[in-house]
Design a protein with these regions (language model features):
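Generic beta-sheet signal
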Residues: 64-65, 139
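Active-site metal-binding motif and surrounding structural segment of the metallo-beta-lactamase
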Residues: 6-8, 19-63, 169-171
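Extracytoplasmic/secreted cell-surface and envelope-processing proteins
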Residues: 20-21, 47-50, 71-73, 147-148, ...
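Mature N-terminal segment immediately following signal peptide/propeptide cleavage
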Residues: 1-5
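Solvent-exposed, polar/charged alpha-helical surfaces in well-ordered, non-transmembrane soluble domains
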Residues: 22, 26, 30, 53, ...
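Extracytoplasmic/periplasmic copper-protein system
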Residues: 69-70, 195-199
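Metallo-beta-lactamase
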Residues: 8-10, 16-17, 70-192
Length: 201
């Protein structure tokens, strides 16, 4: 996910590896000459933080919640090995921590990018990202059209986190899901709650 602001670009989710981050940066250059100055690690898993090293190398600041930074510190090597079990070609990446952390919710791009933490879900630390001007919610790995990988999910808290999201009454018309088909309407929240209910029965 990419947000092109007035003066610079914010990348939401650092991608899987330095190479995928480089490819994304090249695609961004085809859209805008504005520099990438901020990258949000939206959770501590490699698909959201694996490209940190590349983005740092081009001068971007890596940003996350303190919880994400703490989980990266504690579990990064373990998570790389976990990915390699399913994808043996995945590189052994060193830990690259965020440059700046927040205790909870935070805003970037003058309020155009709002990171929201509502509790455990797909991971203990996953955040939503809300773009109020565009009326778009990025669902991260938390919202998608299939249950997906729940190995690190808190199944008892996951529905509560989604209910808290609903209670915010954010003004969005589009949800960008973290995996599979990306574009959905607000109904994706209830659809995913129904999927979770089938898992927790």
């Amino acid at each position: 996910m990419v947000y092109v602001g007035d003066n610079f670009v914010t990348v939401i989710g650092a991608t899987w590896t330095p190479e995928t981050a480089r490819l994304l940066a090249a695609e961004i250059k085809e859209v805008t000459p504005k520099p990438i100055t901020e990258v949000i690690d939206t959770n501590y898993h490699p698909d959201r933080a694996g490209g940190n090293a590349y983005f740092k190398s081009i001068g971007a600041k890596i940003i996350s919640t303190k919880l994400t930074s703490d989980l990266l510190t504690k579990h990064w090597d373990e998570m790389v090995r976990y990915v390699q079990k399913g994808a043996p070609s995945y590189p052994t990446l060193p830990l690259v921590l965020p440059d700046k952390t927040f205790a909870g919710d935070f805003e970037l791009q003058g309020g155009g990018v709002k990171a929201i933490y509502l509790g455990p879900s797909h991971t203990p630390d996953g955040i939503f990202v809300f773009f109020p001007q565009e009326k778009v919610l990025y669902g991260n790995c938390i919202l998608k059209e299939q249950l997906g990988n729940l190995d690190f999910a808190n199944l008892s808290e996951y529905p509560k986190t989604l209910e808290r999201l609903k209670q915010l009454h954010l003004d969005f018309t589009t949800i960008v899901a973290g995996h599979w088909s990306p574009i959905h309407g607000p109904e994706l929240i209830d659809e995913y709650l129904q999927l979770l209910a089938t898992k927790t029965r």
